[in-house]
Amino acid sequence: MGLKRTVRNTLCWSLASGLILLGYIKRTRQKALRDNAIISFYFHNPNRKLFRKLVAWFKDNGYTIISYDELIDIINKKIACPGGAVWISLDDGWKENLDNVIPVVVEYNIPVTFYICTDAVENGMFWWTKAKASSRLLPRELRQAEALRRLPEQQRKQIINQLNQLTPPDAYEREAMTVDDVRYISSLPQVTIGSHTISHPVLPNCTDSEIDYEMGESKKKLEDWTGKPVKSFSYPNGVFNGNERQFLEKHGYELAVTDEGRFADLNDDCYLFPRADIMDDGSFAENLCHALNVWEPVIKRFKRIIKLGR
């Protein structure tokens, strides 16, 4: 971890610890246990200590961790929403999830949903980490993943394909699950599999045919690999513009999840279901504030105060 990131995490830990001491978590907990609110948050590649500590905290404090099927039944008003409902998911399909997440899932017997990016499963790496590792081969203006994310999808794919051709398949260590790994976690009674597209594109940069392919083909592959229906979708990068809805409907998805950090409720659009983003390298205190929808409102308030003071 670089110095800037270390400083950032230390400052955020201090702020989060202060918010906890000031009773923000306690008040939010009372609201979550009282109202028909669903606490929804997701990870990418957490270490085992962070994942276990968050799971244990919610289990020990009277929350109910619900499965994907229970979530859908609650949304469709087939069952009542329990007080303090929590739904947990993970994006991408990182191989380290097998060592850091799955043992905790089995130990605590908690349901989780994995949103899998199929291209990374088949090729071993996620495109943004390959771009970073091979940045010396890119033009200077495209050496940051954010610059590549701004490109039209066809152009981004061409660049990544060129990098694949210029680097041998075994040049980098595998970071994504294998097909057998996906089959294995899908066989666990606690796990549900969802789609995270094929290539993890920025969907608003895609043509209609590209969106159609990303949503349809990833679903088909995951269903072929697992032998189970894939009914939900996670927007890559949390980015969307509304054009995706027609393809979600076409391919039979019943839920699509975002990275909007707030509680979900029974009136939410099923294709814009919110989830708070857990920081893989952040502290427990900061991430508890993220999960319980404390962090974002406070940060927005600070930003408004700073803006008014200028």
Language-model features: where?
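Short, glycine/acidic-enriched loop or turn micro-motifs at the edges of active sites
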Residues: 94-95, 199
